[in-house]
């Protein structure tokens, strides 16, 4: 009898397994509820679209303060999470997910997630870039040689290919039930977004046609000396405030900083002020160069992260 009962129990468990699998929650899929909007803001370009209706609304925004630099922000109640970091990836092209930081929006307090430096490139190309960066770190004082790429080999062209193939954005705010924004192909929207970034160059005093001919970008000589722990604003430290600041520097043909603009998604302007003040004073550069060695004005982007280390 004991053996018979044991076999019956195993069979019963096996029969219940499909029911448990079927109960696994499906992803929350949200369709667009607005068109893509490109916002030519004063110092940035934004690409914005809303998904879902009512309590399921999620707003997605891409933001760029310079060509080739892009952050991504998503906010809305469906993104509620207890995690401090949330991963996302573009489907069906994305492989390895990329992580973002969770924050709370003001004044509604809706969940918000910020992903910094979103590349929108294939994993193998990102790995290649990382390898080059790691090798450069071994020789931080050596300026990389000039690079000449065909139009189809440029990161811009490869990003456009990636964006065209991407049709969804998966956000793992709840690991057992991700939110999927059904974006459709991102190719046309990203192309319009990049045009805004190109148009912004003229507003900064940078010639877009000249910028496209640069084979050696601006080179920073001493970035490790720009900011230190001592530069953390004391009032912000006492308040426990943190921030991430994107610093955009205009560099003339002699390597001199002619303008500094600091931008942040955080509402703590003291971090912005400190970043520009210290970097403008301490930074040293070699200017951008054309193929014939002519030095030309260009720009340089630096991200400054203000974090309080845990005790």
Say what each PLM segment does.
Residues 252, 257, 290:
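Short, acidic, Ser/Thr-enriched surface-loop or helix-capping motifs
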Residues 105-227:
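Internal interaction segment
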Residues 210-248, 273-311:
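Short proline/glycine- and basic residue-enriched helix-capping loop/turn segments at helix->loop/beta transitions
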